[in-house]
Amino acid sequence: MSFSAAQVDTVRSNWCSMTADIDAAGYRIFELLFQRNPDYQSKFKAFKGLAVSALKGNPNAEKHIRIVLGGLGRILGALNTPELDVIYKEMASNHKPRGVMKQQFKDMGQAIVTALSEIQSKSGGSFDRATWEALFESVANGIGQYQ
């Protein structure tokens, strides 16, 4: 799926505001993901056996959260370019062995959209939920085609 220049600008702008406090945003994303999908926590080696409340301050959790958010940053940087397909293939290859499939990417997208919406609401910034939802549908489909 291709996104308009305005949509790309919107998601990148929202992303930049989130990265101002990336640790807090990352913890919120995973808190939402695991509250909604408790069984997903076992798919993350760094989070296994941790209470969701214990993610903050855990160096293994922090490291993995930054890896996940870094991957999303790569996707946003590659929107509407051929590089995006390369990233999708890599993510599919990295996640399939752990049973992380298209649905899990959709669910992660929902957690990210909710967290970003909260962050934008607190900062008074605009948030185009429909564009973000379309983006994560596209991401899940893009990765899913290689699984």
UniProtKB/Swiss-Prot annotation:
One Gene Ontology MF term: oxygen carrier activity
Keywords assigned by UniProt, alphabetized: Heme, Iron, Metal-binding, Muscle protein, Oxygen transport, Transport
GO cellular component: extracellular region; hemoglobin complex
Binding site for heme b: H64, H95
Domain Globin: 2-147
One Pfam family named in its UniProt record: Globin
Record PANTHER family: GLOBIN-LIKE PROTEIN
Family: Belongs to the globin family.
Misc note: Adapted to the low-temperature environment by a decrease in the oxygen affinity via an increased ligand-dissociation rate. At 2 degrees Celsius this hemoglobin has an oxygen affinity similar to other hemoglobins at 25 degrees Celsius.
Quaternary structure, from the entry: Homodimer or homooligomer.
Official protein name in the record: Globin
